[in-house]
Regions:
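Acidic catalytic motifs of isoprenoid enzymes
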Residues: 1-61
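Structural helix-adjacent loops and short alpha-helical linkers that scaffold large soluble proteins
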Residues: 2-10, 77-78, 113-119, 195-201, ...
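Short, mixed-charge aromatic SLiMs
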Residues: 13-28, 88-99, 124-137, 208-218, ...
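Stable alpha-helical elements in mature extracytoplasmic
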Residues: 14, 64, 81, 100, ...
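Accessory "access/gating" subregions that flank catalytic or transport cores
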Residues: 36-58, 67-78, 86-91, 106-210
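Short sequence/structural elements of tandem HEAT/ARM alpha-solenoid repeats
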Residues: 79-83, 119, 235-239
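Catalytic phosphate/nucleotide-handling subdomain of diverse soluble enzymes
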Residues: 92-96, 103-105, 109, 187-270
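Acidic, carboxylate-rich catalytic segments that either coordinate divalent cations
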Residues: 135-177, 227-304
Length: 304
């Protein structure tokens, strides 16, 4: 649920407001989100609520699949996006789980001001500490994409052999089930690189890589949508969205249509707060050079 006030930067920047709304919302949560809700309701506040000592799902995909909006309201302002990720992402994730959201937010932000997918993938990665497992995994995706530019399956197999292990999520440790942020981020990047700007191919590859295979194509296609714009989305994909745009999400007063308005309002606020301008229907932004986020404290097992 959004707080009752009209959407503004103040709401995002007021951590206590976000924490309270997150913990007390009526809708169900799972994994890192649910553990964080439990923690907050029992007095363990962010960032401790997302820390691996208190949250066994700290490396899960939760923040990674929620960070899209952060990049979308920060056009070209990759470091501003990272600052928002720090406030929001540490509610439920930490370490590699947090880096996943930072990275996706960075790619969305850069997608406004870059048309080249490789540039977006590599520039966004500059926000992530090189010592992290997450960084190493995405570097491997880029490496094997270059080695096998025409066969995503060979790249997938290399990544599977090196990075498809689950060491955190209790439901996934002894099963094939894996919602680790790192491996699923790799599948998003594979979809983008091998999809080469084609919406169907991007979603198809990100889906067929497996694991969290509804979220990954959604993330990859979302980034592609920012690069190319709404008009470039093939008509085939639009009717299903249009039919549900005005349906309210369960336990909220928010529909997809209202989300569009909320995000545009937030984008306008972020733009003005960072030296950008709005003249009529034209938006002028400030382009930031990516800065590396400080390294979260990692588990000993993350050094493997």
């Amino acid at each position: 649920n959004m707080p009752p006030e009209s959407p503004s930067l103040a709401i995002i920047e007021a951590s206590s407001t976000i924490n309270k709304a997150f913990a007390n919302a009526d809708y169900k949560l799972w994994h890192a989100n649910q553990a964080a809700r439990y923690n907050i309701l029992h007095g363990i506040m962010p960032p401790a609520s997302g820390h691996w000592k208190n949250n066994p799902h700290a490396d899960d995909i939760d923040f990674q699949i929620e960070a899209d909006f952060i990049g979308m309201i920060c056009p070209g302002m990759v470091n501003t996006a990272s600052n928002f990720s720090d406030k929001i992402g540490h509610i439920m994730n930490y370490g590699d789980g947090w880096y996943g959201g930072v990275y996706m937010g960075a790619m969305y932000a850069l997608a406004y001001v870059n048309n080249d997918i490789y540039t977006i993938v590599t520039e966004a990665l500059k926000t992530i500490p090189e010592q992290s497992k997450f960084h190493r995994c995405i570097i491997d995706v880029i490496k094997y994409w270059k080695q096998y530019p025409d066969d995503w399956r060979k790249c997938w197999l290399e990544i599977e052999n090196r990075h498809a292990f689950e060491i955190g999520c209790p439901e996934g440790v002894f099963n094939a089930f894996n919602i680790d942020a790192t491996i699923n981020a790799a599948y998003c990047v594979m979809g983008l690189l091998y999809g080469n700007g084609d919406f169907f191919k991007t979603m198809d590859i990100a889906t067929r890589c497996g694991q969290d295979s509804d979220c990954n194509p959604a993330t990859a296609a979302g980034i592609l949508g920012v690069i190319q714009g709404y008009k470039a989305i093939p008509e085939y994909w639009k009717p299903a969205l249009e039919r549900c745009e005005n349906i309210k999400f369960p336990y909220t007063d928010i529909s997809l249509s209202s989300v569009y308005d909320i995000n545009l309002k937030l984008l306008s606020d972020v733009l003005k707060a960072n030296g950008g301008k709005i003249k009529g229907d034209k938006y002028y932004t400030t382009i930031q050079k990516p800065k590396t986020e400080k390294k979260d404290t990692l588990k000993e097992t993350d050094t493997r």
